């Protein structure tokens, strides 16, 4: 069903490098951190791994050579492929088996905490644990690329406008969180994520803000195209 759990052989990884978003070395580093996989048909697998290291699911996506999504090929969940592989076409049985998801990159929270804890014990003059700030974007592609350009943040991705929910922000509650929604002409994404942020703040006391960067800086034409942070920063 897929060749390996980790790798840079997907069309996505090749496109990221060939279009100048990352160097080969940066792509290798990002692929290892995010544990990118590759399917047998060349799709990239964005594994969703929680803070315990458990793989909850994986999203298989397809990209064109210009590093934009191949809209002729719909994203697929690994869990759905497995269900159909083992259960055939039993629609009712497949529908009865739940799937669980988290933000793409959630496992980085645990790795960050371990690194910071090591720093604490290596410096006898300081015993305070400082966690990294977390940036949440919509697309996995955006998180992967910006993680190499702005490493001061831990970059996580919701995987879609409506995939961001307050409960998925619970593991982030001890971090400062900045949400970077995509832009659009009607403030739909910003408004939606603002409401999610408010709910997370109410439920978990999250230190969370929604960045207005794209709403304040994007041109009307860019908003019409519904650009994201990578589109704006690279202006390709």
Question: Over which residues does each language-model region extend?
Answer:
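Intrinsic-disorder-associated interaction segments
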Residues: 5, 20, 75, 93-96, ...
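Phosphate-handling DNA/RNA-contact segment within nucleic-acid enzymes
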Residues: 45-173
């Amino acid at each position: 069903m897929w060749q390996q759990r980790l790798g840079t052989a997907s069309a996505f990884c090749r496109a990221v490098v060939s279009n100048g978003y990352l160097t080969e070395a940066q792509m290798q580093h990002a692929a290892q951190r995010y544990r990118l996989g590759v399917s047998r048909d060349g799709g990239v697998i964005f594994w969703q791994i929680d803070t315990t290291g458990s793989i909850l699911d994986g999203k298989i996506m397809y990209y064109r050579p210009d590093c934009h999504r191949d809209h002729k090929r719909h994203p697929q969940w690994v869990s759905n492929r497995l269900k159909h592989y083992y259960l055939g076409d039993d629609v009712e049985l497949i529908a009865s088996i739940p799937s669980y998801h988290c933000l793409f990159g959630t496992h980085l929270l645990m790795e960050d905490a371990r690194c910071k804890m090591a720093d604490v014990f290596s410096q006898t003059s300081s015993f305070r644990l400082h966690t990294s700030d977390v940036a949440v974007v919509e697309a996995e592609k955006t998180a992967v690329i910006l993680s190499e350009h702005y490493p001061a943040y831990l970059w996580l991705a919701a995987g879609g406008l409506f995939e961001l929910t307050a409960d998925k922000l619970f593991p982030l509650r001890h971090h400062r969180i900045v949400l970077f929604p995509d832009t659009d002409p009607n403030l739909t994404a910003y408004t939606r994520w603002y409401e999610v942020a408010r709910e997370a703040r109410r439920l978990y006391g999250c230190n969370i803000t929604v960045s207005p960067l794209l709403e304040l800086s994007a041109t009307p034409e860019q908003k019409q195209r519904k650009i994201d942070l990578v589109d704006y920063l690279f202006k390709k």
